[in-house]
Amino acid sequence: MPIEIPTDLTPELVPLSWLIGEWEGRGRLGTGDEDSEHFLQHVSFTHNGLPYLQYRAESWLTDDDGTRLRPLTVETGFWALERKQLDADGGPGLVPADIVPALKSADEVEALRNSEGGFDISVSISHPGGISELYYGQIKGPQIQLTTDMVMRGSHSKDYSAATRIFGLVDGNLLWRWDVATGGEAGKGLEAHASAFLARVS
């Protein structure tokens, strides 16, 4: 399936452009074995002309046939190429970006390509319960690998120390896996948390 790049997309989002749209499908909690619970997920990646994608994922527990049982969770965040922020970029807060984007051409974006042939990315994701994740990783064509650099927890949040996520585009579908560590040293003891197979719906 060809990927259509929006005409108003800022150049540095082109490597992430295959994510843009809405996705929906089913997944399994844990290792995905016979006893793992099922869930339904709706994911959206949108853009507003600035150099990041807005991300939202809403999930529901389901029965084996896919009938919704009850809400599971919602997470929201931002995805962007990882680079130094320039004077032309917006922020912090309501400081506006320049009308002309910081990276104006494909050549300027190409200069960010890393030694492995991909692009470094950063992803921030917030969850209910006072937990926020900051991931760093790489996008290389239709494959994404992310590892938490930091997990921020409120004083009453549940224990959660690290995570990895992988995403891939396979035959036009979005596949992902999420592993987490809920105790001990960050990055140690990662266990399968969930995985899903999502089809593009718009």
UniProtKB/Swiss-Prot annotation:
EC number: 5.99.-.-
Class of enzymatic activity (EC top level): isomerase
Pfam families: THAP4_heme-bd (PF08768)
Record motif GXWXGXG, residues: 21-27
Gene3D superfamilies the record matches: 2.40.128.20
Residue sites binding heme b per the record: 193
Protein family: Belongs to the nitrobindin family.
Subunit structure: Homodimer.
Protein name: Peroxynitrite isomerase
Species per Swiss-Prot/TrEMBL record: Pseudarthrobacter chlorophenolicus (strain ATCC 700700 / DSM 12829 / CIP 107037 / JCM 12360 / KCTC 9906 / NCIMB 13794 / A6) (Arthrobacter chlorophenolicus)
